[in-house]
Amino acid sequence: PWAAKIAKALTLEKNKNNPPKTTIQLAELVSRTIPRRFHKNGFHPATRTFQALRIAVNRELQELELLLSSLSKNMLKGSRLAVISFHSLEDRLVKQTFRNWSQPCQCPPDLPYCICGLKPLGKVLTKRPCIAGQDEIENNLRSRSARLRVFEFARKTGD
């Protein structure tokens, strides 16, 4: 919800010939832009801004999509694919991909039976994502956002 305000603040600073030159300056600008009452305890207000920049620069979602597409064409029967995601955009992509692999039918829902002929590649083994327990989070703070999903291929793919 703050992207437009942050972008406007960056533009104003740029127009004043004073754009942020360091990550600390950018973090301070973001912190000033987001009202204090919206600062979450334990998280710097600029955390999501840096995350968004990293995701965009590294093309993380496109790369994950490419990887999943490639893997779906090269798996052996009985093989399992485990994916750990670290933010909701990645997790949503993995969840939707696994669902499409396990329920590929594209027939209209009002048809009494499937006529498209698409067969499932396998099944999702994790109904809900596995998350780190409290002990793991205490020992490894980064694990707090990790989500594990597993898919088992029921047939050889790529044929």
State where each predicted segment sits:
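S-adenosyl-L-methionine-dependent methyltransferase catalytic core, i.e., the SAM/SAH-binding region
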Residues: 1-159
